[in-house]
């Protein structure tokens, strides 16, 4: 194996992620020619050829797009159920071998959807959700074993009427790359079930053993939940148990994921290299003990133990759901144990390179995944400490454990910081304690209890003990997250400190000269991450005027609304986007990453226009993570939503019509605003949205919330009553996402906006913005932008009265 091939693989993979398949292929051809001219290393070229062939084989599957004309259409799908999860939002099915019946085009919208003889196979998998309120979509077990319950559906064919859409990212400079994740997972589309037509026979194929293991996994999870309910275990303890043993991460709440991220312990509850390697090690140790009395030679015993360890680790990974981290762990374990399995004498770097190469061959696009780099950096750190270390006394081995944890923390810190933008400052200390506890005590104990539970019922004391231990651990983690310094945004860390960590990491690698090529594993990641972070909106020029510029950002939160107003160190948010029953919310996914990227950790003002979930869904989530000085709630009272806001009573007020006043409490920066509470005039629902007018250096912005025609008419009628207020605005945040029941001609004639900014989800089921509205905007001389098409929209106002509109996408 030659390092040239390694470099080419890294740069091609990362280039694929950044520049597209074709451009990266041209790059690799140029590099290949350079190797042919400079060297004649056949094995490097052979390895590169294998990699390219594997990549080409995956290209169609990875980059297959769900046909846009099928979005939001009723489709009939024939598929095999390969995975099933019961979540807070409903029942989630993962379908494989999907065949779509193409609907016949309807000339009458009222006509029933008909399907012709044409069908198309979908590459990859399809994820659909069955919502409890859709009666026609509920699963039909068709006489299956009632003891199996829903788990009996796994491995069976189903015919469903579904609505699907392809994967799409929220188009903001800072966002979770859901599209890349779905490509890595091989997931082509997602949606929901409208009608369950039939349940067929069992699926037959090469993945039959995996389907049977998945069915067993689901049955074990149902049994574990049943025992836990009988013993009254705390929900967090049950979720942790399921995640550690069966990979049931869906049982963890959004709040639990935030705690894990803040304490740097996410890797402990996601089945990955730590868990798979531990299971393999325990199996190998048990096998060595079993064959010890048989007098088998040492070399044969090592080989036999390695094969058994790998087989047990593979079964455990399959039982855990065989997610991407588990897949990488099995591949890496195979590479690292390759020499032991075949009796070969391979060095650490050779084994690591084999694992690295095989991972890229099987999952080429994983090189742009943060988990890929974390996994190999962690193994590298452990190898630096343990490789070729002679046996020493127990205290020396203990020091090696501490050194290994220190190396992990040091080397993973820059990778995590560059990949996520955050670092956990308490993570190194927490992991110093919890990694040995989980590895040596907790995971083996939970595995033993779980296996025993399958064979015979256990006494209540075991469940109580597990509950006490897991609850205690969780309480400790939650306590650490309350520390103000527990987590930091990379942008807050001085460049010298961050650079020093990178330099020290490099020195640690260079201490052993034969490790220097592996240092290059980090360099492309750093280079491409920094290159990607230089988005056009991130480079906002400094303004020479005394008053700082005002930035108004309409965030892309899908079908919802969130507007961020920023001037100097002052910040206001208007609405917070949606929160779904699964726990996913736009505050965690979009709003907080955007704010933290600018170093913002507190809000001067938070305005909730009205109580619809697509505007207020993330309220509690944001209040748990950000300091809010003033909280302005809707005029209408909603007790069910306000019951958890008692702690903020001294900061709360309600939307009320006001005269012009300074938005900020100090006089250093001036930004005039006024509220118009339409609920005071007898309106309710959407029409009672809190309307905001901003006067920014002589320019006016109208934030209309979800008002519709009736409220618009009320606003027009009130023009003469509200201190001679004028509705004429340079920028209008479109009422009600541009629905056909809003943006009336009279309203637009009074506002006369130069720009209309629409917040709507792509291919949303409501048809927002309506075509008649966009035509009306043009007719009134307004330019309009839609977050569904243009992504995040930034408007910059400078003190000389000039302003510019900058969409994230052209």
Residues of each region from the PLM?
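Hydrophobic alpha-helical segments
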Residues: 1-17, 301, 339-340, 453, ...
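N-terminal leader/targeting segments
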Residues: 1-77, 190, 194, 201-202, ...
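Alpha-helical transmembrane segments of polytopic membrane proteins
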Residues: 22-32, 374-375, 431-437, 493-497
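Hydrophobic alpha-helical transmembrane segments in multi-pass membrane proteins
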Residues: 46-48, 191, 253-428, 490-540, ...
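Membrane-interface helix/helix-cap signal primarily in integral membrane proteins
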Residues: 56-267, 584-585, 589-596, 602, ...
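Non-globular, low-confidence helical/coil segments that flank catalytic cores
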Residues: 78, 138, 149-150, 154-163, ...
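Aromatic-rich juxtamembrane segments at the membrane interface
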Residues: 184-329, 338, 604-607, 700-705, ...
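Alpha-helical transmembrane segments of multi-pass integral membrane proteins
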Residues: 380-488, 754-759
């Amino acid at each position: 194996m030659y390092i040239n091939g390694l470099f080419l693989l890294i740069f091609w993979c990362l280039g694929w992620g950044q520049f597209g398949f074709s451009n990266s292929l041209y790059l690799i051809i140029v590099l290949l020619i350079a190797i042919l001219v400079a060297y004649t290393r056949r094995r490097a070229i052979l390895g590169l050829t294998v990699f390219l062939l594997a990549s080409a084989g995956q290209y169609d599957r990875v980059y297959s797009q769900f046909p846009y004309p099928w979005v939001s259409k009723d489709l009939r799908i024939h598929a095999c159920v390969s995975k099933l999860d019961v979540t807070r939002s409903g029942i989630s099915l993962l379908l494989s071998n999907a065949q779509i019946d193409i609907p016949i085009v309807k000339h009458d919208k009222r006509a029933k959807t008909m399907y012709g003889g044409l069908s198309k196979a979908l590459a990859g998998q399809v994820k659909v959700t069955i919502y409890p309120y859709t009666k026609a979509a509920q699963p039909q077990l068709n006489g299956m074993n009632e003891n199996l319950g829903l788990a009996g559906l796994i491995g069976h064919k189903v015919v469903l009427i579904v609505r699907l859409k392809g994967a799409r990212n929220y188009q903001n400079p800072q966002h979770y790359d859901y599209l890349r994740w779905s490509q890595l997972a091989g997931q082509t589309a997602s949606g929901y079930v409208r009608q369950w037509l039939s349940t067929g026979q069992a699926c037959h194929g090469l993945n039959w053993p995996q389907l049977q293991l998945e069915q067993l996994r689901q049955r074990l999870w149902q049994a574990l939940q049943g025992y836990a309910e009988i013993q009254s275990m705390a929900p967090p303890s049950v979720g942790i148990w399921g995640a550690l043993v069966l990979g049931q991460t869906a049982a963890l709440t959004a709040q639990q994921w935030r705690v894990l991220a803040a304490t740097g312990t996410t890797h402990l509850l996601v089945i990955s290299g730590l868990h798979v390697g531990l299971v393999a090690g325990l199996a190998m140790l048990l096998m060595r003990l079993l064959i010890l009395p048989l007098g088998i030679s040492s070399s044969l015993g090592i080989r036999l133990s390695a094969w058994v360890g790998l087989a047990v680790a593979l079964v455990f990974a399959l039982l855990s759901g065989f997610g991407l981290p588990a897949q990488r762990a099995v591949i890496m374990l195979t590479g690292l144990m390759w020499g032991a399995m075949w009796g070969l004498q391979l060095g650490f770097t050779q084994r690591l390179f084999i694992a690295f190469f095989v991972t890229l061959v099987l999952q080429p696009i994983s090189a742009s995944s943060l988990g890929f780099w974390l996994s190999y950096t962690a193994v590298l750190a452990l190898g630096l400490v343990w490789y070729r270390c002679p046996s020493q006394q127990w205290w020396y081995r203990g020091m090696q454990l501490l050194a290994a944890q220190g190396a992990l923390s040091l080397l993973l810190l820059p990778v995590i910081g560059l990949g996520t933008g955050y670092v956990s400052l308490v993570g190194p200390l927490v992991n110093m304690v919890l990694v040995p506890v989980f590895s040596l005590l907790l995971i083996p104990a939970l595995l033993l209890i779980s296996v025993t539970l399958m064979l015979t019922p256990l006494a209540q004391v075991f469940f109580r003990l597990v509950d006490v231990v897991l609850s205690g651990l969780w309480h400790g983690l939650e306590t650490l997250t309350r520390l103000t310094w527990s987590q930091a945004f990379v942008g807050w860390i001085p460049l010298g400190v961050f650079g020093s960590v990178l330099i020290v990491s490099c020195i640690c690698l260079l201490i052993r000269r034969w490790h220097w090529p592996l240092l290059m594993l980090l360099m492309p990641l750093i280079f491409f991450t920094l290159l990607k972070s230089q988005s056009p909106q991130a480079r906002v020029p400094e303004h020479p005027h005394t008053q700082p510029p005002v930035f108004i950002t309409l965030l892309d939160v899908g079908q919802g609304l969130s507007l961020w107003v920023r001037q100097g160190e002052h910040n206001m948010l208007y609405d917070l986007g949606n929160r779904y029953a699964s726990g996913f919310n736009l505050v965690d996914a979009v709003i907080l990453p955007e704010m933290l990227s600018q170093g913002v950790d507190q809000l001067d003002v938070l305005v909730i226009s009205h109580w619809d979930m697509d505007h207020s869904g993330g309220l509690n989530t944001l209040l748990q993570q950000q300091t809010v000085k003033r909280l302005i709630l809707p005029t209408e009272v909603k007790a069910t939503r306000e019951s958890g806001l008692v702690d903020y009573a001294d900061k709360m007020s309600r939307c009320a019509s006001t005269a012009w006043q300074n938005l900020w409490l100090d006089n250093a920066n001036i930004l005039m605003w006024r509220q118009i509470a339409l609920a005071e005039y007898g309106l309710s629902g959407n029409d009672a949205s809190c309307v905001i007018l901003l006067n920014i250096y002589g320019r006016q912005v109208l934030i209309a919330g979800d008002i519709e025609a009736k409220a618009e008419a009320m606003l027009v009628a009130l023009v003469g009553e509200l201190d001679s207020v004028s509705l004429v605005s340079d920028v209008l945040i479109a009422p009600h996402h541009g629905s056909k029941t809003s943006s009336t001609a009279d309203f637009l004639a009074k506002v006369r906006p130069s720009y209309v900014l629409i917040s709507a989800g792509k291919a949303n089921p409501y048809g927002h913005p309506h075509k008649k509205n966009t035509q009306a905007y043009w007719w009134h001389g307004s330019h309009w932008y839609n977050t569904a098409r243009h992504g995040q929209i930034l408007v910059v106002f400078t003190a000389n009265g000039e302003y510019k509109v900058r969409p994230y996408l052209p």
